[in-house]
Design a protein with these regions (language model features):
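Extracellular loop and loop/strand-boundary signature of outer-membrane beta-barrel proteins
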Residues: 44, 82-88, 143-148, 173
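Gram-negative (and chloroplast) outer-membrane scaffold detector with strong preference
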Residues: 59-139, 159, 164-170, 191
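Residues that define the transmembrane beta-barrel architecture of outer-membrane proteins
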Residues: 37-41, 52-56, 89-95, 111, ...
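Short glycine/proline- and aromatic-enriched beta-strand/turn motifs that initiate or cap beta-hairpins
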Residues: 24-76, 100, 186-190
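Hydrophobic alpha-helical segments, especially transmembrane helices
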Residues: 3-4, 8, 47, 101-102
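Gram-negative outer-membrane beta-barrel domains
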Residues: 149-153, 157-191
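Short polar/acidic secondary-structure junctions
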Residues: 48-50, 104, 177-179
Length: 191
């Protein structure tokens, strides 16, 4: 019995194309003059705690429709490097562009899954514990780490999670943080 694999592949391709077309049309409508009238502001404050990293961030964006938000993220971060003579804290300020996608559960939209994707850069402001005094000759030496004050580090971050709407537009959210600089969890509040 000969199986025809063309039909399932063609059907899957048509479904994928139509889904992409529907999403593209939805985004196009959101950016139209009529769609921009429905935009709403969205602000969040979040804390990140991870393995060898911690920090906080503030996001400000525009909810272009009920499922999507685009905006800017700014934060203060501390990354910890293990070095020969202990630990070095790398302090930085970061800025990023982000997009958020909501997957609402139920008509009242009290519970939602979300996915944040951010692309940004962190400016290294300070190194703590990077210098030590050699007891033999009394000379101050720098630890062998790959970053220095004034460096810019680019990063990509993905933060999926669960959002719970508490009162009107006040909501809490929690989820993992998967980033090129941090692996951990985040907890925040948004309005």
């Amino acid at each position: 019995m000969k199986k025809n694999v063309f039909k399932p592949i063609a059907c899957a391709a048509i479904m994928l194309f139509s889904l992409t077309s529907v999403q593209a049309q939805s985004i196009k409508e959101s950016f139209s003059a009529e769609g921009r009238k429905n935009w709403k502001s969205e602000v969040t404050v979040r804390g990140n705690l991870g393995i060898y990293a911690s920090g906080f961030a503030v996001t400000g964006g525009v909810r272009i429709d009920e499922k999507r938000t685009l905006g800017l993220m700014a934060g203060k971060n501390v990354n910890v490097y293990t070095v020969t003579h202990g630990y070095t804290d790398v302090n930085s300020f970061s800025a990023a562009l982000y997009g958020r996608r909501y997957f609402h559960l139920g008509e009242r939209k009290i519970f939602s899954f979300y996915s944040d994707l951010a692309l940004g850069a962190a400016f290294v402001t300070d190194l703590e514990g990077a210098y030590w005094v050699d007891p033999v000759d009394g000379v101050t030496k720098k630890e062998d780490i790959s970053v220095d004050k004034g460096d810019v580090q680019f990063y990509i971050s993905w933060q999926p999670g669960v959002r719970v709407r508490c009162y009107k537009n006040l909501h809490l959210f929690l989820g993992p943080t998967l980033s090129s600089h941090c692996l951990g969890v985040h907890l925040g509040i948004g309005f």
